[in-house]
Amino acid sequence: MLFRSLLNDNPDNYYQNCVIDGSYDYRIFGTRGTVDWFSMGSKGSSTDVAVMVDTGYIDSSQMEFAPDGSFEIIASATKQPGNWLPLAPTSRSIIVRQTFGDRKAEKIAEIQIECLNPDKPNNNLTPEALERGLMGAAGFVKNIGNMTIAWEELYRQHINQLPSDDQERCQRAGGDPSIHYYQSYWKLADDEAMFVQLDDIPECQTWNLQLSNYWMESLDYRFFKVSTNKHTAHYEPDGSVNIVIAAHDPGPKYPNWLNTLGHGEGGMLGRYVGASVFPKEMKSRIVKLSELS
């Protein structure tokens, strides 16, 4: 399986992306699987991450499924009965987020897509089309790099804090409209820890907090605990959650330890998914590791 980490990609997500043209109609179909939740959003660009504005949205809580878990969605500019993903003439991509509660235990939805009204096929590759494709790919890489640097400089203005982010900016970069983002930057000495206390968790589909490196690439969640969420976290008797971010295990009193994996600084991102109210911040403070023992 190919892994691509960028812009604080969610360790709880399985991402899928498809280039489309909003002037056509598409049938998206498949089987539900057991993944906790998934969403599909049509976006206004497939290569420029600065203008990937939302042009349509649907998620599994809004969909109808057959008894065997199969489903069908029509993606089009014209409203359709049943499961419908709106498109606009400017739509250029569809992004799928399959969000796990427990990644190791759940099965992803199997999804396919077909165009319902394609033009007559033309497989003749022209020099102009090749140039557009290559320049688009190069532009995507350049835009990602520039955006990463710009965002990290911005988030270092509130280092080791988790305030509510600029949601409009997140959406322009391809964010999910059902997610409220808390994006920031952490920096810790070897003997320090960041103590995050979630004592006002809203009613939501799920929530999570993750760590990334300087380049906003998620740390290796395949083999290490670098994130936690609604389903995997340990809760206190009062329903709150205490999370410790540190280079060293703070001990059994703090089961929600996120390992910085040798990094001294990097990005971090908290999310509330499907909530209607949001705290202004995820509360945090810096402590010495020795204070936690």
Where are these regions (language model features)?
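A compositional/structural signature for long, glycine/proline-rich flexible linkers
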Residues: 1-293
